[in-house]
Amino acid sequence: MEQTWRWYGPNDPVSLDDIRQAGATGVVTALHHIPNGVVWPVSEIKQRQAELAAKNLVWSVVESVPIHEDIKTHSGNYQQYIENYQQTLRNIAECGIDTVCYNFMPILDWTRTDLEYELPDGSKALRFDQIAFAAFELHILKRPGASNDYTAEEQVQAEAYFNAMTEADIAKLTGNIIAGLPGAEEGYTLDQFRVRLAEYDGIDKAQLRENMAYFLRAIIPVAEQVGLRMAVHPDDPPRPILGLPRIVSTIEDMQWLKETVDSIHNGFTMCTGSYGVRADNDLVKMIETFGDRIHFTHLRSTCREGNPKTFHEGGHLQGDVDMYSVVKAILTEEQRRQSLGDMRPIPMRPDHGHQMLDDLHKKTNPGYSAIGRLKGLAEVRGVELALKRTFFPELKQ
């Protein structure tokens, strides 16, 4: 696997020197300063590449080229935004980058309710609390029809949770959910968020699939022409939230995506932490089934709690993800590719990480502190090395 590291650009508290010292050789980044829907100029892409090259690093994967909401809703100026997206892909390929990660989650990117969940050892993790989220939907956002998405017991628990909240608690929870986490290009106020939600009235899973299919039929031919591998990131969490459909959550969704535009350039980001939240997602089976379409991997683990929809981020070798078996399946796919002459390793980044040691006293992007990811990268690197020497001696070390 190619060891990569996500970097949020010049304002990221984690520097390029830090990344190099972590042992990563590739960087996963994006032009976050360019608004959604605007074409990325070649000059801007090359400028970012030059910044990385100055530190002996390469831009391995673009994560992400955000998809404008008009495309997802198939409304407004969607056709122009698709044309802009196509041109951005051409410009990325012109600069020699061949992998683009993206997602098709409506409105929100990845979602958490607690960004500082304290673990028994004193480190901090990200957490999604189903009851806290219900309290937000039912009593803060007051989304019409939200009660249909929760059991009677969850509604009682959510009301008790809300009644115990202070104004500061309400503001913090609201900000955690809708203000935008790292990688999300847009944040909202409550009123703005309600307006956005209303734009999805009448858009169910079938309609969102149709909208995504229209997008894929427009951009995958461009990816084929310029040699780009598109890698869709799964929903996080992998289920409908806020009354919004989610369509990249299960192996059935992966099969639908493959069949919709059957091209090797229409591929996946295997995010084990996103898919792994669902106990019914067999990660190894996903890799074995769609191995040739997996163009990028995010390796992390989560821990499901008493309510099966509540989870927190676990250590990379702990929690509900069998990282040993996952890495072995990825290396098996790499071996298959190399036997066919494709020598490029699959890019991997250690996804998220606990806030720990002196990072507890620093400004960090939630989930993206340096030391927690350094620990995760070292652990995954160790698993990979042991597997290679035991089962895959012919793979490049």
Swiss-Prot record:
Its cofactor is Fe(2+); Mn(2+). InterPro entries: Man_deHydtase, Xyl_isomerase-like_sf. PANTHER family: MANNONATE DEHYDRATASE. It comes from the Bacteria. It is an enzyme of class 4 (lyase). It catalyses: D-mannonate = 2-dehydro-3-deoxy-D-gluconate + H2O. Catalyzes the dehydration of D-mannonate. Belongs to the mannonate dehydratase family. SUPFAM superfamilies: Xylose isomerase-like (SSF51658). Keywords: Iron, Lyase, Manganese. Its EC number is 4.2.1.8. It comes from Yersinia pestis bv. Antiqua (strain Antiqua). GO terms for biological process: D-glucuronate catabolic process. The gene is uxuA. GO terms for molecular function: ferrous iron binding; manganese ion binding; mannonate dehydratase activity. This is Mannonate dehydratase. Pathway: Carbohydrate metabolism; pentose and glucuronate interconversion. The keyword Lyase applies. NCBIfam families: PRK03906.1, uxuA. The keyword Methyltransferase does not apply.
